[in-house]
Amino acid sequence: MKDYQRKKTKYILPAAVYHKTLWTIRDYHRLKDEVSTMITPKSGGGEGTPPSGDPGDPTYNLAVKYSQYLDIIQAIDEARNNIPREYDLGIWNNIQYGARYPQDAERSTYGHIKSRFVYEVAINLHFV
């Protein structure tokens, strides 16, 4: 699968930012899984356990990571809500799995909306 950016559109990003945004979108499901496992309590700790050797405040570090993941998920969800419903699944499957666009509209229509979606995610994540 070749990831290239459409040239004749107003949603142009630098190549590195475009690819970084695509891979951030592709990481969506892992981030959702990480967030769901972060909020489950973990056993261990307490007075009888040996120190972990990790410097700093592990609770604070976990909270920062949790907040960063939620910001990324929210940025992707906000941009995805701006995609017309009839094109949403086709664009999402194309980015996530490399699936072909459905035959219900022109490829150029899907390509234009995909470039706008990737551009909006990059803006929401403050990549540009």
Briefly describe each language-model feature range:
Residues 89-92, 106, 111-113:
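Domain-scale macromolecular recognition modules
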Residues 110-128:
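DNA major-groove recognition helices of helix-turn-helix
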Residues 97-109:
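Helix-turn-helix DNA-binding module
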Residues 1-82, 125-128:
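N-terminal interaction/assembly modules
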Residues 82-97:
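Short amphipathic alpha helix immediately N-terminal
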